[in-house]
Amino acid sequence: MELENIVANTVLLKAREGGGGNRKGKSKKWRQMLQFPHISQCEELRLSLERDYHSLCERQPIGRLLFREFCATRPELTRCTAFLDGVAEYEVTPDEKRKACGCRLMQNFLSHTGPDLIPEVPRQLVSNCAQRLEQGPCKDLFQELTRLTHEYLSMAPFADYLDSIYFNRFLQWKWLERQPVTKNTFRQYRVLGKGGFGEVCACQVRATGKMYACKKLEKKRIKKRKGEAMALNEKQILEKVNSRFVVSLAYAYETKDALCLVLTLMNGGDLKFHIYHMGQAGFPEARAVFYAAEICCGLEDLHRERIVYRDLKPENILLDDHGHIRISDLGLTVHVPEGQTIKGRVGTVGYMAPEVVKNERYTFSPDWWALGCLLYEMIAGQSPFQQRKKKIKREEVERLVKEVAEEYTDRFSPQARSLCSQLPNKDPAERLGCRGGGAREVKEHPLFKKLNFKRLGAGMLEPPFKPDPQAIYCKDVLDIEQFSTVKGVDLEPTDQDFYQKFATGSVSIPWQNEMVETECFQELNVFGLDGSVPPDLDWKGQPTAPPKKGLLQRLFSRQDCCGNCSDSEEELPTRL
């Protein structure tokens, strides 16, 4: 019914825009949902938290911000963080401006006459940097100085930070991060598509207004297909990878009937839709090259964690609101142990490398093959080994993959043809990306000569296409085929062990990013204006335990715990 689709789309668009109010999609009870505990409630967390400088002060977004606030109270530490910020800026500065940026860093932070000389820096190292800067401003010029600065901060300053109110506030945020996650943490919206074990729908965190995609894995369907290991593998790999070019896992929870993965919402649709349903099939070369470069960065991040993807194809590459891509659907990914190879005839016909088709052993070579196939398809408007809407038997496609070279038209420039021929090389030992240098080999190809990969990796390059914010890039609600009911499968108490491994709640870095991006951190992270300790951080003012509720109070009181508050009277309609 057309009306149902219009209503579902209208509700989703309104949610994406923040609901039209000042709260930007937040519940009217959001402060109550994110209320800090008294610091005395965080003592167990304090004792169990690993004292790792890199994790607490660099990798975790809220930890990094609070450590910077602590450093701002001491001039010598402020100089160190300013230097680190300056180096980060230097590394993403365009080539023609980098030398001037490097000279400013040398003058301000490394010269005895500079205003912000950083401590503990060997003068010989400074001299070497100055000489290298004159010869040519390479991106890693300040790498050793950066390492020494972090080493300095990780000693006495880090120890002092652990005894400060800033670290106590970090413990309060960690306490909130570790609160239980349930279906009541979210508002649910329309179905966006189907996964292997259930629907994918849009959802919104009540406390922050942040939009996500919720991938629901039906418990009975998982059990019937014996998919427990596959589902847990995807969840654990998503949890491990932190890349702007791979969808992020923010939450994992369970309901009575399903296991739920809450992932980055990609509103721009997938590359298959854009290649074939937005005018003439295929992209201009510049657009295809931009997407190939971002996919290359995503594969590099996966391979750095020794993860091979194995299912690279247009429908698994999604666009965000701004037009940047992320790799999605990690169901076939697998970890490759150091020094070992793996075996597995998995993937999608037409994108599987010859060594996969032959069931031979491999490490990361199938991903570089598939990148070549995808780049070819983006430029040519069709797959290199099968024509769209023309049925070819699987055996014939696999023969073409193993034996026949791809054909090129005049849509390919010489550089594009060169890269496309080197990536899908039949021999994995000769394939670009597999000659010992990994992603670096691919990035150094002349087709990417005009791209600054440092700026690309920082999200600083403008994409060639920006999706329409008023468009819904997916099928109509009624065109998404519904799953049939699973019969003959009963859930048993022994299944709970698997569900507990899966439903682990919030994922640290995405959750903290959510708090920062939605300005919850900015609004809640308040200290005493006159330097006084806030009541929730004051050990002297420990709260008294509230009186026990009577039976009737317990029966009729509303659940008001962090993230699980229901505020249905103010909510937008959910999926019809």
From Swiss-Prot:
Domain of life where this protein originates: Eukaryota
Entry-linked Gene3D superfamilies: 6.10.250.2260, Phosphorylase Kinase, domain 1, Regulator of G-protein Signalling 4, domain 2, Transferase(Phosphotransferase) domain 1
MF terms in GO: ATP binding; beta-adrenergic receptor kinase activity; G protein-coupled receptor kinase activity
Membrane topology: Lipid-anchor
Region N-terminal: start-end pairs: 1-185
Protein name in the entry: G protein-coupled receptor kinase 6
Reactions performed catalytically: [G-protein-coupled receptor] + ATP = [G-protein-coupled receptor]-phosphate + ADP + H(+)
Protein's organism: Rattus norvegicus (Rat)
